[in-house]
Amino acid sequence: MEANHSEQLSAERQSTPPGDSSSLPSHNGLEKEDGQDSPTPVQPPEKEASVHPDISEELNRQLEDIINTYGSAASTAGKEGSARASEQPENAESPDNEDGDCEETTEEAGREPVASGEPPTVKEPVSNKEQKLEKKILKGLGKEANLLMQNLNKLQTPEEKFDFLFKKYAELLDEHRTEQKKLKLLQKKQVQIQKEKDQLQGEHSRAILARSKLESLCRELQRHNKTLKEEALQRAREEEEKRKEITSHFQSTLTDIQGQIEQQSERNMKLCQENTELAEKLKSIIDQYELREEHLDKIFKHRELQQKLVDAKLEQAQEMMKEAEERHKREKEYLLNQAAEWKLQAKVLKEQETVLQAQLTLYSGRFEEFQSTLTKSNEVFATFKQEMDKTTKKMKKLEKDTATWKARFENCNKALLDMIEEKALRAKEYECFVMKIGRLENLCRALQEERNELHKKIRDAEISEKDDQSQHNSDEEPESNVSVDQEIDAEEVNSVQTAVKNLATAFMIIHHPESTPHQSKETQPEIGSSQESADAALKEPEQPPLIPSRDSESPLPPLTPQAEAEGGSDAEPPSKASNSPAGLGAETQCEGLPVGAQADQASWKPEAEASGQAPQAPTEASLQKMEADVPAPACAAEEHVAAMVPACEPSRQPPRAAAEELPVGASAGPQPRNVADTNLEGVD
């Protein structure tokens, strides 16, 4: 079908004049679209094409007979007529969507053989076709223009649009050039065809002779054309009915569209009303805005006035500030002068402070000599230092403070004298304790020897008694032995308890708040009473034990007359025995002193020996008085108690009563007690 359509276009271009050929190349792009749209309406002519070839064959046969009869000249004319006859059914098959196309093709097919000698009748259908083609081309151009505009709208930048148009123009130029070449070829063909036409016109005269024979053929063709016309009329009627249906449908759609348009018009009216209302609201808002602007202008004016007032106040304040600054400068100068004066005064005070510090160093050098022994004087020194720090701040009161310090210095000297006296007493006490410890060691050794001898004797006696009475009194011996052993144990326990009590009373130290050498006389009757209580304790062996010993179960022998004799011989020198109550009096005096003085007493011994020889006279006098007051039996009782002490040594447990009754001063001077402990351990 496309080939037939292209042949029709070529025939139309041959019929068109050369002046109109320039308008055709630009429409080649739409010819393909027409060729694509053509197959849909071409379906009914295909049935006609199946009928035409039979008639054409019969006509060809008849023409061959005519050509054979009329010779070679007529044969060429017959061939041309057959070619044109073959072109007629092809022209009838061309696709035309319009209603009058089928009728025109049938009329042309019937008129061409009749009016073959009249050329103007042939050009009329060609011109009609050209007009239709031009209309189609214009329609196609509108579609192409729309497509171009759409493609251009898709692009964003003008450069891209320009590139797209340039490409399109290049394509159209190529097509135009190809079509011009085709046009030249067609023009050449047209010249040839015109030459042939001239020849055919010469031969046309010859063809008239064959007209008679061809009339019959024409009649048959007319009959055939009538049938075709009837069919075409039927088709036209059907198409008219279809058109009517389409028009009715189109009218219904138009009515719907009109209804929609009316609805839209109503909506538009509503929108217009809303727009008018909004415009009125906007006007009211604008009026309010103008009123607010006027109000704001008034407010701004009021604020400007306030700002002017504030500026005036600021100027006044600045003037006041300037005056205040001037005053401040004056005060600053005055204060600087005062500061310079105060600095000078401070320098003077610092010089005075250096002088006073020199004096303080002198005093501190004097007091450092006493710091090694007087631990309690550290507190006095601390208070003294605090007062000296205060004196740096209170320079006006230095004279009064110096007077007070002088008085305190005298008091300290008196206290030092007292301490020297106490030191002498303690030295004598120490000697007494050393003597006592030596005696106790000797007694312990003697008692241990006696104990061992007694144990041996008891064992020998038991063995002999067992051997004698083993045969006769086997049942009575255990009872008698048990009774004897119990009596011995009870005696030993009582003797140990009395010895412990005597030791406690012998080492008793009475506490007194004040330590003066005058109180030693007051302590003497107390010591005598304690010695009397010790003697009473010796006479009362039946008292319950106060301090249990670990080795109380072990039998201890009673004291022998030899031990008592030894104790008496050791107690003969009365001067040594008289030192013990003097030592107790000294201990009572030491407890009146602070703890620091007792702790630093050891360091004062060489100094007291070197510098304290002069004040020993009153201490010796007091000792002689104490020796005269204390009776000799007291010393003997103490030695007797000391002789009983070694019985308690195996227990290795110190008496609790003595430990609890010892004062703080006894713990401050631990040297003589340590020596005694080491000696006792050696005895054990």
From Swiss-Prot:
Residues 1-132, 458-485, 514-632, 646-684 are annotated as: Disordered. The modification Phosphoserine is found at residues 474, 483. GO terms for cellular component: cytoplasm. Residues 93-107 have a biased composition (Acidic residues). It comes from the Eukaryota. GO terms for molecular function: syntaxin binding. Keywords: Coiled coil, Phosphoprotein. Residues 1-26, 613-622 have a biased composition (Polar residues). Expressed in skeletal muscle. Residues 135-351, 378-467 form a coiled coil. Residues 45-64, 458-475, 514-524 have a biased composition (Basic and acidic residues). Binds to the C-terminal coiled coil region of syntaxin family members STX1A, STX3A and STX4A. Has a preference for STX1A. This is Beta-taxilin. It comes from Homo sapiens.
